[in-house]
Structure formats: C-alpha cells, structure tokens
C-alpha cells in the first residue's frame, strides 16, 4: 500500500530495478519452487526489516569482477587457483554447437518418457526455469525440445544454455565477466537507490497531500515517484503469482523498455484479431473465444503501458475496443482494501463516484462496553505508533462528510520521507466510528500478517477478516489469470507426452524383438572374416557326410597313412582307442586323464573322427572342435593330425579333413570335420551362436592348466549340455586333479592313460655349480646385494649466514644381515656355498646356462650322449636375450649346434624346425616357454634345463590392471618339465634352483580365475547375454569372491563399458569385448585408433603391460636420472618412454646395431625391454585392426620416427586419460620461496594423499593441475608411479560422470573433480560425451565404417589439439 518516497536524481534502469526488487522482496523470501529448491539455488533475499524500523543502509564496498554466481560458492571457486578455468575459442565453440545441433537433427529418436510425469511436475519444472529468469518463449521451447526426448530440468537448462545467444541468457548464466557487489541485490545498485526500498507490506500505498512539516518536492521528483509507482503497479499486475513461490531474477526488469513492449503487444494484438476473424469464418466458437481472450489480455496490458512515465505517445494506436471498454469499477470491498494501489486524489475519486451515483456501503460498527472492555482501534493505533515509531508524531484523523455519513482519512508518518495515508470507502453513521474504522485500516496496513485483529472489538475484527479474505481471493484470481497461458501450455505438452508414451509402449515389443537379432554384419565378423567362417560349420547329415566318408577311405589307402598308422600304434593312448570310443557313445561327458607324451591331444580327436566317418548307421553330425590354450599348440597338432590322415595339402587344404583356427589366421575348408582352435576363438563363436548348433563334439584340452578362459568355457558348456542332448564333451587333462573335473560334471567317467617315459636324473643348482666350476663374481649382475628399497631422508644444511636449507635425498637401505646357509650345503665347496648364498634367485643366470651347455659337451659323462637340449625360459624377452648370447658366443659358432627359438609370435618355419631331428653329430638347443611342458612334445629331448620361472597373469591392486609377471613354477609344473627329458631314453634335468627352494614351491598353480581381474570375463558374460556376472561366475569350478566380481563391474562402469544400473554393455563395452586385452588398455587402443594415433598409443599400452626400459645400475643413480631427464617431455613419464623409444628406432634405422647399442648405453635403456615393447606393440595393433579399427594413414605414413609436436602431445595425453581414468589426482601445489629448493610433488587422490615416486620425471612438479598415474604403491609412504600431467579437456571428454552446476559456473566430474567454466562451455562438454558414444554405436552397427572423415571426431580432435594453444 504505502511505499517509501525518496528523492531520485534521475529515472533509469537502476531505479526500475530498485522499485521492482522492493515489490518482490516478500516473494523472494519464499524461495524458488519445485526442483529449484534443492538443486539450483536462487539468490538469497535480503533479511526482513521489522515493521516500523528503518532499513539499514548497505555499506559501499569495493567492486569485484568475477563470473556472476547465485551464491558464494561460485565466487570462491573463482578465487581458488587450483580450480582450473576451461575456455574454448569463440569460433570453435560456434562450430562445435553446430555439430551438436546437426547431430541432434539427424538422430531425432525420442527417448523413453517417464510414466510418472504429471501436470504438477511439469508446472514445477516450468516455475523452476521461470525462477532462473528465462523468458516464457524460451522456457516453452526448452521443455518441448527436451521432455519429448525423455529429458528433465537439467536437460532443459542444457538446451537453453546451448541454444540461446549469450545476451539472451539470464543473469548468472551469461558467459561474460560481470561486475558485482558483495551481498547486493539487485546488482550495480547505488546506496541512494537501495535506501528507498520499501518493506514488502508497503508496496500498495496511496499518495496523498504532504504534511506541512515535509518540504514540498520538485516536479522532477514527482515524475520520478510516479515512475516508481507505475513500475510497482505493473510488477504487481504481472507477477502476482510469485508471492510465496519464489523470487524472479532481474534480467527482464533491467532491460525493460515500455515502448518496445508496447509495439510487441500491438503486433500480437493484430495477429490475434486476424485469428479471431478466421475462426469466425470457420464458425469455430471455441477458437474464437480463445482469440477474444487473448485480445482482451493484450489490450489491458497496452492500456497499462500507456500510463508509463517514459511511454512515447507517438506510437499509441487507437482501437475501437479500447475506446468503448473501460476497466470495470472496483467493488466496495476492493476499494476498502485499496487494492487498486494507485487511487486518484480524494476529490477526483468523489467526483467519479458522484457521476456514477453508486450506492454507498454504510455500516454500523457500534459496540457496547459490556461486549468489549479492551482498547478502541483509535487508541490502539496511537499506542502502537508511540511504541514502534517513537520519533513520529501521533496519527492524524481527518473526518470527511459524505452526505449524512462519515469516513476518515488517517495519516501516519513513519519517517521523514515515508507517510502512510489511508481512507476507507466504507461509510459510518457517526464520525467516531469513522475514526475507529480508519485506524483499523491503518493497522491492517502497518502490521499485515500479524494477529493484531484479535485485540480489536468484534465489529472491527470482522471487517479486518473481510479485507483479508477479499485480498486472498483477488490474489487467487490474478494468479489464475496470469498463469492461464502457462497452464494451457502444460496441458498441451502433457497431452503430447502421453500420446508419445502410448506409442512407445505399443512399439516396445517389436523393438525388443528386433533388438535380439544380430546386425547383418556384427563386430565378431571383423575379428577375422574368414576365421568365423571356419567355425560356422554347416549342419551335417548322413547324405552330407557321404563325400567326406569317401575322401577318408581314399586317404586310408595312401602309403603315408599306413606308414604313420604304425607310429600311432606305438603311442600309449592307442591301446585305449576302443574304450574311449565306446565310453563316448554311452556318456555325453568324459574326462581323459593322460600323462604328457601319451598322445592324447592328437589321437583322441583322431579316434572320434574315424569312428564318426566309418559309422554308416544313423545320420549323426560330424563337426569336432578341439580347443588349445595356445596358438602354437593348435597349429602343430593340426599339422600332425593332417599328416596322420594322409592329407598332402596340409591343414585346411582342399582335400583335408583337419584344419585349425587361431586369432587372425584360419586354415579350414568345406571338407574340414576336425578343427583345432584356441579357447578364445571358441568363446567368440559362442557370442554369435550361444548353443554351438553346428558342433557335434567339443574337446577341451589341457584343462588342468586352469586358465581363466578354459574355466569360463566349462561353465558355458555345462549349461549348453542341459539344452542340447546331442552335444558331447571330452575334457583332456594331465593326471593332476582330474577327479575335480569329474565331480563338476556330475561324476562323469574318467579314462586314465599312462605315459611312455624313462628315468630322469635330476641336478639342482648346488650340483650344477659344483660340477661346472662356475664362479659368481661380486660385481656380477646376478649377484644379490640385498637391497630392498630407497629411504627418503631430509638433510639440514646450515649456511655461513646462519640460514638452514632442507634437502631431500634417497639412500639405499639394506635388509639386514645376510641369510644363514642351510647345513645341508656344508658338503659342497665354499665356492658353491657362496654362489648359493648370493646368487639372485629372482634373476635368471644366463651366464650359468652358457657354462652348463659347454659342460654338457666337454664332460665325459654327457658328451657322448646324443639328444636335444630343451631350455625352459619365462618369456620371449629371455628367449631373445639368450638366443643373442648364444649367437654371439664363438663357442657356439660351429655347426655342432643348432639353436631354435620356440614361441607363438615367431615364424612357423622356426617352430617347425623344433620338431625335426637334426643331422647326426649336431646338438639341437630349443629355447621355449612353459608351452613345452604339456602343450607340445619335442621327440628327441634328452636334456632339460629348467630355470624354474614362468610368467603368470597377475592382478595389481595398485594399478587396477593385470600383467604378466615373472614367478616361480609349481611343483606339478617342475615335474612336468622334468618328464620331458625321458621320452626316448634315460634323461637328465638340470634345475637352476636349489633343492630347498623346490620343496617350497606350491603343489599346484592357483587357478587363473582366482588371481586375475575379471573385467574381460564380465564383458564376455554380458556380450553373450548370460545374465548377471555375479550369478554366472558362482557356477564356476572355483568361484571367485563376490567382491572381486563387484570390483570388476565397478571398473567397467567407471570406464563406460557397461550401463550403470544393469549388466548391459554400452557401445564402448561391445568393442572392448572384441579385444582380448585389459579393459583399460583396450579403451586406450580404441580411442587411439578412432583419433588416428594407434601406433604411439599401442607403444604406450605395451609399456603398461611390460616393465619400463629405463634401468638404474647400482651406484649410477644420478647419471641414470640425468639421462632420463634429458629425454623427458611434456611432464609425462609415459611420453618420456615413448620419446626414448623414438630415439632408439631412429638410432636403429640410421646407424644399425652399434648405434642402437650406443644409444641404449648412453641413455640407460634396456635393449631387450625395447625389443619386447616393439613386439607387444605390433601384436596390439594387429588386435585392434582385426576388431575393425584402423589407424590414421597420416600418422602411419610418416617417414621414420619424428619428434612429438604440441598437437601430438595434446592428443596422446587425451587418449592416455581415456584409458587410465580414474587413476587421477589433484596436484597440491606448494611453491617454495626459494627457487632452488625442490619439494616433492604431493597429489590428492580420491583415496587420500600420495607422493610422486622419486623415479618419475614429475617428482619436483609444482603447478596447479591434475596428474594421471599408472600405479599406486605403498612403501614407507604411498607413491604414484608413471605419471602424466593433463589438462582439463581430456578429463571432461573421457572422465567419469559429468555434472553441470549451471548457476555456480562449475563443472564436476565424478563429484570431486571441479573446473570453472561458463555454463555454455560446460554443456558443450556434456553433449560431446553423447556424440562420442554415438560414434562408437555407429561403428558397432557398421564395423567397416571409416572414421577418418567423421565430423564429430574431427571437431573433438581439433578441440583437444587447440587447448591452451
């Protein structure tokens, strides 16, 4: 009612903001409604001012420039340097938005709509957006474009921020830096204007003549006050609905132009008239009625605008309706409430009433002393003013005669510039009642909302309640009128949503049915197009087998078949042929337990094939699949069986009954009925054909090795057996633990086959050293120094001036006294005892192997014994290293020796040579891994040298990755290796470990499924639709712990491979299931391929699976660190290794072997490790290309190794982040005052604080940012190994769940990684995530699709490369 009136110097936007803010102060106290209450806070209102008290003046403070925020968090964030800012070039930003919008147009599929949407929820969403001060049209566009696609409030905000221009965004959302004052609302408001704000209850006042004590105001001031009153009235009429619901922002008020608004309304009015005329012609009464309502609404608002003080009369338009129709006269109750807000002068009001001759509202408010003993309203008002306004004079009462009735004008001076004047329109029969009624109305205005009316006489109490009820009704009517367009829009939108929801429910069964079908060309086809054709065996019948049977009979009659048949008959397994075949006819599952060398791997599949082809009865299938754990086994066994069958064309030839299939290589034909394949190939076949419909017999060989793939395959086969009664399963194992497999398959029969072996004499390390005369030098690389780790110490150095400087140094710490020697070794020489005590058991002594080989040829005991030497080594690197030593040692130059390396990555010719007998007088030396334990048999081996080491897949909790680590073998494996020496005659086994160590070996190796991460297994389970991984793996032979499975699923969710709430693969997960590598490495490789940098990424991935090529010799740590620092690049250990690799390749190409060796020595690099990196890199690249991805020709086309450019580094760091996330931490930058002082880099990770390892190039890094790390290890403290400094873009593009905090201008990743960003940029990154998923989905649907010219990838690549450039 009454408002504060203060002199203004000039009308303007600030005054408008001040006045409107005053009119809304009370509504601001209620807060925003709906989701805005909890999720997106709006600005806090000013504290309420007690009635009658003066408002405190806001103290002028220093101006602060920052991104405008709705609360303190945003501002504080801007002051925190550790929260990095994200900025995109303006032109690039516009292009990215164009790509996003284009993608949305092309992919306009509507998402699932929530069935719980209601009009109330839509209204809450509408009002929440309205509370953010978005315009009505923008709100409606946003809701239409997002809710119909399954969106919510966040989706609508994202749409608005992405599609509105910066100047169209409300305050707090725009991208520009804005000026703000602490705790000021509205912004940029001067102290003088703020002081004029009136309390919420005084927004409806009537200006009367001034008190003589108050100085008369100038005409200019009156105009300004009129402007303020007009704004208050307009705000009241337009925004009545906001009372009690929430405060609205000031964007529209700050930019309000009545003339522009008037012209807009005039245009809309003309449109509405044309629409009404059209409806009239169409006789559409409903449409005509709606159009008339619009016309009336526009006209009312235009009339209001015409009263604006700065309205330009030149643009005023005359319309008939405006001239004819006048606003309806207010009711007496409304007049009594003075709800018109802006009454004209008393004289004008009486004159108007006189003209209209309206009947007066005359009432009697008399009450007796008996009915009321309290104060009268007049006395109550006087006492209230004295108490609450002690500096103000007593209220004045001016009686006004209206005919024979009375009313009273009451005047209350609240302050020098604030006078409340009220005059009720209700008339009384005497002057005293009029004074009491005026006092009641004054109290109603002064203490509105309080229960003062209970202290008044009953008659005045009733009129008070009457006023209150009428005011509420009026507010409700105004609210309904104002909200009518909104409610109409919500009703239409809700109707559309329900219609779309019904359509989705009708289409869902069809889509689910279609979704179960495999795409026409699925991703498995690109594992190897021809490979899967080999496993896609055609269904066979008796007629189909006729040509094959005829072929087999022809082969049986060949001399080659008959000659090899005699050799087969000498094998131990051959005499069990009939029992094996008969048992298989009676039982569907059989376990064949045979010793190594019994011939089971070649003969059991051969027996089955012969029986099925020679059996003329029935029309049984004949498609046999025999799985092998290694590729070399599959190839060599298939080759041998082909020879035994008499096939001249070899495996997979035109007239061959036997073939093989390994990764990226297939040898099979139409006549193939026996297929040897790796376990992984059959698992991929199961992803395509879950029941193996075309297979009649499955033979799983080497099940005793308990690889994770074979255990997984057994679970699937056990379930298939319950669904297919015609499938037969044969498990072939060494004699170890065969009963366990029988029990797993409901106590199926076991056929035990003895082996053919001769006695083997065993020599242990102590015997070998004693006999060969080997001397272990103290400076030898194989001599144990008992060094465990380096300890960090702090040294205080006092300078001449008395200052103290601290230095951090690392000194080697010994583990203590040397271990005591077992008394058992006292019988050996002191030289042997010294060797046993100090020889490093964890390092293979290649020098000792050379001495032993020489000893075999020189000692009288062995030099006359013919036979091959089989050396068991842990991996390819050791094979290559020993091969190089033998090749360069002149003692082995002569033709007396034939050195053969046996490994699955080597050529087929080299592998074939291992199985051939050498010429007489030539000693064959075969270097092999544990594949020679049981997988293959080299027929002429007499000597076995067992290093006792093997490589096992092991999970590292520190890096959440698995890798092949070197470890000791089990007793069972050692005995298998020993047995290889006794196949043709009495043999000899030389163990390069002591007898005491052998006794400490485990009896059996731990099943792989219990010691490796299960991410890859979970991917296969979900890919094959086998249900929940937890439920499926509980059926395994040795079920892993639920926590391990849960960890695997959590990691898959983190990297985006499966859906967050169900065991279902995402597009990325579908691709990762096609790569038999660790999921983190797989993700790196996929992103490396799609961003055109597969070669360097494959090298980085190889580094993660193998050990670092950098070495630190004892006593040369400083030199090694200096050499590593010279190769350091881009604050990254990973890129430093790649830089070293590039230098090695360059030296290799330019200077040959000598230059290569010199480069490695100069930079402290292990050449063997670099060779291993090269081999693993090539293998990984083959895997990725086989899965349908190819690297960019531009990168592969580079001539020779080149230095990394800035753009290359940015791209490689982004791909590293894609693979290693969430192994990331925030650098706790603590810059020292002394520039020479080096502080260790401290990092805050999600699990706590850690320190960068001393071996890292980032050890002394001190800057704000985020650090990727490969591994987290705990020594005396927690260290991060292999780290890389990354920028915000990679984290935002490839990190965890991203959330946009619109008002705070913050981006959060996984709820703890924060970046500052204008809201539009924040939404861009959120949308780019969706685009990356869409690219992967398209690639999944069409594996042959080229990604080289994809617009989405091009724009993302450009974005990454231009960061900070």
Swiss-Prot record:
Residues annotated for ATP binding in this entry:
594-601
Biased composition regions of type Basic and acidic residues, renumbered to the chain = 206-222
Where is the Helicase ATP-binding domain positioned along the sequence? 581-754
Q: What class of enzyme is it?
A: hydrolase
Q: Where is the composition biased (Polar residues)?
A: 187-203
Basic residues composition-biased segments:
1-10
Q: What is its EC number?
A: 3.6.4.13
Q: Which GO terms describe its biological process?
A: formation of translation preinitiation complex; positive regulation of translational initiation; ribosome assembly
Ranges annotated as spanning the membrane: none
Instruction: Describe the reaction catalysed, as an equation.
Output: ATP + H2O = ADP + phosphate + H(+)
Q: Does the keyword Cytoplasm apply?
A: yes
| Major location (coarse) | cytoplasm
Q: Coiled coil: which residue ranges?
A: 281-308
Low complexity biased stretches: 11-36, 43-53
Any one GO MF annotation of this record:
translation activator activity
The residue numbers the entry assigns to motif DEAH box are 701-704
Which residue range or ranges hold the Helicase C-terminal domain? 848-1025
Entry keyword annotation includes NAD: no
User: Which UniProt key words apply to this protein?
Assistant: ATP-binding, Coiled coil, Cytoplasm, Helicase, Hydrolase, Initiation factor, Nucleotide-binding, Phosphoprotein, Protein biosynthesis
Which compartment or compartments is the protein found in? Answer: Cytoplasm
- Subunit structure of this entry? Part of the 43S pre-initiation complex (PIC) that contains at least Met-tRNA, EIF1, EIF1A (EIF1AX or EIF1AY), EIF2S1, EIF2S2, EIF2S3, EIF3A, EIF3B, EIF3C, EIF3D, EIF3E, EIF3F, EIF3G, EIF3H, EIF3I, EIF3J, EIF3K, EIF3L, EIF3M, DHX29 and the 40S ribosomal subunit.
HAMAP family the record matches = DHX29 (MF_03068)
Please give the family membership noted in the entry: Belongs to the DEAD box helicase family. DEAH subfamily.
Q: Which purpose does this protein serve, as stated in its record?
A: ATP-binding RNA helicase involved in translation initiation. Part of the 43S pre-initiation complex that is required for efficient initiation on mRNAs of higher eukaryotes with structured 5'-UTRs by promoting efficient NTPase-dependent 48S complex formation. Specifically binds to the 40S ribosome near the mRNA entrance. Does not possess a processive helicase activity.
What name does the UniProt record give this protein? Answer: ATP-dependent RNA helicase DHX29
Q: Which source organism?
A: Mus musculus
């Amino acid at each position: 009612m009454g408002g504060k009136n203060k002199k203004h110097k000039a009308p303007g936007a600030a005054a408008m903001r001040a006045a409107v803010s005053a009119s809304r102060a009370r509504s601001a106290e209620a807060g925003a409604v709906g989701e805005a209450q909890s999720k997106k806070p709006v600005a806090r209102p000013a504290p309420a001012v007690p009635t009658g008290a003066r408002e405190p003046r806001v103290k002028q403070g220093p101006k602060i420039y920052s991104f405008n925020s709705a609360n303190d968090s945003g501002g504080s964030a801007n002051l925190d340097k550790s929260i990095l800012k994200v900025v995109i070039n303006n032109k690039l930003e516009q292009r990215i938005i164009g790509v996003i919008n284009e993608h949305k147009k092309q992919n306009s599929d509507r998402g699932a709509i929530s069935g719980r949407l209601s009009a109330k929820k839509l209204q809450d969403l509408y009002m929440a957006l309205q509370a953010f001060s978005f315009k009505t049209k923008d709100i409606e566009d946003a809701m239409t474009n997002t809710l119909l696609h399954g969106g919510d409030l966040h989706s609508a905000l994202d749409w608005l921020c992405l599609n509105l221009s910066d100047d169209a965004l409300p305050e707090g959302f725009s991208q520009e830096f804005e000026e703000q004052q602490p705790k000021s609302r509205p912004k940029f408001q001067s102290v003088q204007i703020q002081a004029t704000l009136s309390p919420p209850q005084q927004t409806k006042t009537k200006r009367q003549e001034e008190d003589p004590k108050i100085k008369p105001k100038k005409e200019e001031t009156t105009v300004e006050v009129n402007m303020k009153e007009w704004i208050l009235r307009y705000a009241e009429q337009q925004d009545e609905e906001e009372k009690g619901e929430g405060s609205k922002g000031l964007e529209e008020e700050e930019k309000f132009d009545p003339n522009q608004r008037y012209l807009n309304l005039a245009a809309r009015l003309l449109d509405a008239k044309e629409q009404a005329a059209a409806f009239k012609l169409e006789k559409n009464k409903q449409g005509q009625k709606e159009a008339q309502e619009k016309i009336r609404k526009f006209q009312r608002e235009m009339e209001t605008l015409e009263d604006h003080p700065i309205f330009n009369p030149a643009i005023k338009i005359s319309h008939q309706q405006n001239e004819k129709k006048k606003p309806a006269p207010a009711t007496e109750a409304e007049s009594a409430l003075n709800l018109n807000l802006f009454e004209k002068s008393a004289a004008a009001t009486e004159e108007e009433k006189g003209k209209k001759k309206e009947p007066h509202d005359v009432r009697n408010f008399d009450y007796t002393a008996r009915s009321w003993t309290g104060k009268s309203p007049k006395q109550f008002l006087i006492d209230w003013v004295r108490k609450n306004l002690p500096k103000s004079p007593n209220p004045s009462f001016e009686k006004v005669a209206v005919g024979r009735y009375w009313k009273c004008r009451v005047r209350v001076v609240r302050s020098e510039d604030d006078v409340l004047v009220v005059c009720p329109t209700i008339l009384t029969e005497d002057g005293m009642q009029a004074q009491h009624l005026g006092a009641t109305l004054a109290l109603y205005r002064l203490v509105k909302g309080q229960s003062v009316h209970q202290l008044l006489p009953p008659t005045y109490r009733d009129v008070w309640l009457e006023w209150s009820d009428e005011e509420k009704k009026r507010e409700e009517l105004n609210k309904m009128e104002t909200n009518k367009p909104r409610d109409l829009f919500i009703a239409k939108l809700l109707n559309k949503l329900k219609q779309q929801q019904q359509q989705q429910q009708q289409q869902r069964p069809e889509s689910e049915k279609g979704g179960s079908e495999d795409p026409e060309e699925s991703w498995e086809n690109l594992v190897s197009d021809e490979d899967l054709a080999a496993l896609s065996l055609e269904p066979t019948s008796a007629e189909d087998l006729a040509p094959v049977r005829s072929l087999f009979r022809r082969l049986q009659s060949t001399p080659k078949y008959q000659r090899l048949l005699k050799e087969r008959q000498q094998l131990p397994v051959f005499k069990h042929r009939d029992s094996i075949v008969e048992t298989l006819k009676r039982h569907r599952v059989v376990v064949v337990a045979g010793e190594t060398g019994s011939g089971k791997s070649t003969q059991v599949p051969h027996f089955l094939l012969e029986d099925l082809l020679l059996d003329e009865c029935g029309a049984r299938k004949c498609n046999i699949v025999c799985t092998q754990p290694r590729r070399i086994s599959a190839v060599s066994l298939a080759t041998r069986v082909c020879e035994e069958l008499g096939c001249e064309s070899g495996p997979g030839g035109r007239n061959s009954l036997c073939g093989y299939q390994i990764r990226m290589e297939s040898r099979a034909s139409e006549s193939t009925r026996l297929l040897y394949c790796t376990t992984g190939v059959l698992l991929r076949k199961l992803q395509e054909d879950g029941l193996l419909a075309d297979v009649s017999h499955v033979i799983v060989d080497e099940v005793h090795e308990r690889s994770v793939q074979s255990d997984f395959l057994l679970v699937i086969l056990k379930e298939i057996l319950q669904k297919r009664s015609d499938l037969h399963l044969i498990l072939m194992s060494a004699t170890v633990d065969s009963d366990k497999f029988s029990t797993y398959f409901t106590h199926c029969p076991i056929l035990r086959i003895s082996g053919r072996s001769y006695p083997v004499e065993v020599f242990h390390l102590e015997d070998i050293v004693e006999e060969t005369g080997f001397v272990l030098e103290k400076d030898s690389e194989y001599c144990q120094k008992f060094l465990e780790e380096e300890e960090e110490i702090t040294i205080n150095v006092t300078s001449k001036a008395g200052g103290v400087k601290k230095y951090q140094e690392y000194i080697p710490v010994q583990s203590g006294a040397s271990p005591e020697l077992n008394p058992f070794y006292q019988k050996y020489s002191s030289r042997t005892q010294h060797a046993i005590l100090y020889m490093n058991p964890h390092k293979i002594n290649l020098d000792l192997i050379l001495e032993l080989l020489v000893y075999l040829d020189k000692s009288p005991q062995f030099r006359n014994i013919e036979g091959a030497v089989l050396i068991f080594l842990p991996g390819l690197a050791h094979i290559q290293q020993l091969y190089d030593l033998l090749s360069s040692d002149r003692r082995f130059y002569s033709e007396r020796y034939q050195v053969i390396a046996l490994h699955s990555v080597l050529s087929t010719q080299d592998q074939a040579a291992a199985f051939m007998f050498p010429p007489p007088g030539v000693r064959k030396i075969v270097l092999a891994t544990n594949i020679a334990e049981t997988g293959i048999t080299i027929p002429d081996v007499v000597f076995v040298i067992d290093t006792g080491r093997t490589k096992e897949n092991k999970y590292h909790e520190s890096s959440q990755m698995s890798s092949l680590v070197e470890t000791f073998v089990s007793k069972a494996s050692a005995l298998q290796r020993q047995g290889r020496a006794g196949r043709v005659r009495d043999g000899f086994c030389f163990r390069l470990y002591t007898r005491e160590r052998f006794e400490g070996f485990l009896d059996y190796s731990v099943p792989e499924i219990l010691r490796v991460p299960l991410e890859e297994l979970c991917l296969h389970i979900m890919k094959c639709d086998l249900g929940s991984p937890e439920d499926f793996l509980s059926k395994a032979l040795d079920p892993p712990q639920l926590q391990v499975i849960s960890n695997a699923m959590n990691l898959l969710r983190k990297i985006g491979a499966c859906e967050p709430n169900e065991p279902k693969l995402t597009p990325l997960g579908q691709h990762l299931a096609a790569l038999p590598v660790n999921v983190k490495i797989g993700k790196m490789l996929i992103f490396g391929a799609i961003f055109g940098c597969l070669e360097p990424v494959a090298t980085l991935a190889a580094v993660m699976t193998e050990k670092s090529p950098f070495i630190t010799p004892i006593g040369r740590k400083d030199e090694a660190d200096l050499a590593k620092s010279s190769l350091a690049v881009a604050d990254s250990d990973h890129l430093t290794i790649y830089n070293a690799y590039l230098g090695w390749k360059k030296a290799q190409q330019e200077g040959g072997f000598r230059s290569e060796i010199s480069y490695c020595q100069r930079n402290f690099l292990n050449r063997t490790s670099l060779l291993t990196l090269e081999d693993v890199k090539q293998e990984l690249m083959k895997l990725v290309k086989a899965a349908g991805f190819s690297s960019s020709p531009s990168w592969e086309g580079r001539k020779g190794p080149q230095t990394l450019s800035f753009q290359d580094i940015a791209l490689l760091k982004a791909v590293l982040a894609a693979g290693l996330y969430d192994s990331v931490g925030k650098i706790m930058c603590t810059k020292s005052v002394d520039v020479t002082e080096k502080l260790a880099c401290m990092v805050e990770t999600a699990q706590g604080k850690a320190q960068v390892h001393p071996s890292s190039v980032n050890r002394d890094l001190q800057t704000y940012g985020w650090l990727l790390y490969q591994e987290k290890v705990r020594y005396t403290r927690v260290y991060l190994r292999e780290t890389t400094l990354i920028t915000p873009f990679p984290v935002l593009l490839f990190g965890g769940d991203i959330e946009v905090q619109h008002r705070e201008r913050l981006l959060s990743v996984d709820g703890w990684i924060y970046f500052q960003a204008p809201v539009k940029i924040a939404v861009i990154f959120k949308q780019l995530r969706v685009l990356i998923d869409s690219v992967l989905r398209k690639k999944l649907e069409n594996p042959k699709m080229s990604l080289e010219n994809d617009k989405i990838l091009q724009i993302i690549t450009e974005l990454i490369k231009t960061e900070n450039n």
